[in-house]
Structure formats: structure tokens, C-alpha cells
Amino acid sequence: MMKVKELPKKFGKFGGQFVPETLMNALIELERQFIQTKEDDEFQEMYRYYVREYSGRPTPLYYAENLTKKLGGGKIYLKREDLNHTGAHKINNVIGQVLLARKMKKKRIIAETGAGQHGVATATICAMFDLECVVYMGAEDIERQALNVFKMEMLGAEVVSVTSGTATLKDATNEAIRDWVANVKDTYYVIGSVVGPHPYPTMVRDFQRIIGDEVKEQILEKEGRLPNYLVACVGGGSNAMGLFYPFYEDEAVALYGVEAAGLGVETDQHAATITKGSMGVIHGMMTYLLQDEQGQITPVHSISAGLDYPGIGPEHAYYHHTGRANYVAITDEEALEAFQLLTRLEGIIPALESAHAIAYLMKLAPKTKGDDIIVLNLSGRGDKDIHTISKLLGGNRDDK
């Protein structure tokens, strides 16, 4: 077998490495080390050990009988990534990258976070391995995700509030990149999604593909065949890519990525990058993004802190461009309704990000046949969003 010398830098015309010269050597070294891990049995075994024993994989593929009956149409299965340690899919990637950082002898870990789930996962693994951890987070997201901020600080991470720009994920990412440029010798940057310069989109996908690999095995065991539809929410897009990628060549399986329509795609208050965006460069990659006529990144909005990102992973851009996946958009209001539906019907409180996927499922399922199979990636649990939701749904209680 020929050894992999380097990975493809682009997905069609998307991806690449649009970064300052100071980072090029770091990216080349990162790719070299990552390729080595693919052929390193000890590294792979260590990764499998921690996702199994520490995070609790494999996560269940749960038949949502009540939801199936309510919506009509095909059988609905939920891939329960909410049952991972720390409450979301993010830890799959963090375990892989922090093991890689240790292999590279890096002592300081930095990360960006929107909803706080990637930040919590990074702080958690750094606590376990006794590594210095700095997490950049937009000031607006800090307010929305107070519980996760407290968790990160409890775990020993320094949370840096970013007040520039829209004070959300894009701005936190900008600050993390600045830190990395300044401290590249001893610092490892754990990117939380399938975004950024090569090799990050490929690395994160490879650490997240465990989701789709498990689904394939589990659905064949339960149903004896592959699903007809896969549905997942998309911000940067790592939970969706983790689900989609192992099914890429199974063309009979339809893929649906669900973006945040915010107050509506006809307004300027949304984060529907593929639905409304155009090609450009953001955070070191060529992809679709939300920009004005001058090429400036436009502000984004979503009720969900994990989806309000003005770009999207380049592999998703490629899937859209080639027609392999379908990308749709769901409003704040629709996501809130879906959040309540799943909570009441199945006793599962989803993250607001995942609620966007549920909301699209509510439109898709009734159009499917009774013997169709739909798998939805429940990317995270909703504990972190209770504060936001109680303000929106129960805002008058304090006044009574």
C-alpha cells in the first residue's frame, strides 16, 4: 500500500490555504503529523479508547416512535450525539486534535467557540491531560451561553471575551487566529468545525466521521439496509459532515443540511450561507459566505449560537456545488416549535442547533413513504439553551 504523502488541499474549487506566511510552516507540519497518525496503530487505538471509555461511544441510534407517528411518513431514527460526554458531537474532534497536539509536544491549546460546546469539550480534554487552555468566545455568545462559560472556567480554561465586530463566532475565530500567529511555536489551535485552512476541514471531518460510520453499522443491524434520508443542522458543518461523509458514495441516500434562517432569509437577520451566500475567502478557506458588494462579511443572526457563522465548511460548499447534498434553511420560530415538539413527544431536550434539523424533519417526514428510513443527527442536548428558551417562552412568569 502506498503511503499518503499529502492530502488534497481543495474540494473542487473550495478550501485551500489563505493564511499569512507565518502560518504556512505550521500548517505543513500539522498535515505531516496528521498523515502519520492515520498509519499509526497506537494513535488510532488511543483515539478509539478515549471516545469509547471517556466519551461513551458508540452513541445509540434511537427509533423515535412517537415522533414517527406524529409526523407520518417514514421511520425516524435519532443519532444520539447529545449523549456524548459534554453533551454534543464536538468531543469526537477535540479528543483527536488534542491527542495530535500532545504528539506534536504542544503545551498550550487555544480554541474558538460559539455555543460553548466546542469550548467545553476542549477545556474538558485539556483538564484531563493537564494542558493550558484558552478559549475565545464572542461577548454576545457569552451572555447567551452563561452555563457553558461557567463550565469552561470550572475546568480551568481562560475564557476570553471578544467584543469586536458582531461579538459572535466569526470574531472569536479571528482572535484565535491572531493568537495562533503570535504564538505558533508552542500553541496548538483546535478548530471546532470543518472550516479554516487545509488540513483542518479534512482533519475535523476524519475525527467526526465516526458518527456516520456508526450509523451505517447500526442501521444495517436494525433495518438491514441503508437509510433513504440523512438530516443534520449546519453552521460550520462538522456534525453534518461527520454523518454525511461515510454515505457520500451511496447515491441513493439523500443528504439534507439545515442552515439557520434566523428571522427569515428575506431579511438581513439570518445565517443561511449556502441559501443566500456567494463565493469568497473567510478564515483561510475559499467557500460560500455572507458578504456585501464590497466583499465585507455581513453580520449574521440565529437564535442558536452554534449556527450564526457567516461561512460554511468547504466540503459542504463542494457538496452543494456538485448537487450531492441539499441545503435548506429554518427560522428561529420554526426551531423553537421543533424544540418543544421533540421535548414533549420523546422526552429529549435538543440543543437549539439540533432543533433546526428537527424543524426541517417536520416538513420532510410527511412527504416520505411509510417504508422510508430517515436518520437525523441529534448533535447536542439543550441544557445550554434553557436560559434562552425560558426567556422566549416563559418570559412573563417573573411578572406574575
UniProtKB/Swiss-Prot annotation:
Keywords: Amino-acid biosynthesis, Aromatic amino acid biosynthesis, Lyase, Pyridoxal phosphate, Tryptophan biosynthesis. The keyword Lyase applies. GO terms for cellular component: cytoplasm. It catalyses: (1S,2R)-1-C-(indol-3-yl)glycerol 3-phosphate + L-serine = D-glyceraldehyde 3-phosphate + L-tryptophan + H2O. The modification N6-(pyridoxal phosphate)lysine is found at K90. Its cofactor is pyridoxal 5'-phosphate. Pathway: Amino-acid biosynthesis; L-tryptophan biosynthesis; L-tryptophan from chorismate: step 5/5. It comes from the Bacteria. GO terms for molecular function: tryptophan synthase activity. The keyword Lyase applies. Its EC number is 4.2.1.20. Signal peptide: none annotated. The beta subunit is responsible for the synthesis of L-tryptophan from indole and L-serine. Tetramer of two alpha and two beta chains. Belongs to the TrpB family. This is Tryptophan synthase beta chain. It comes from Alkaliphilus metalliredigens (strain QYMF). The lineage of its organism: Bacteria, Bacillati, Bacillota, Clostridia, Peptostreptococcales. The gene is trpB.
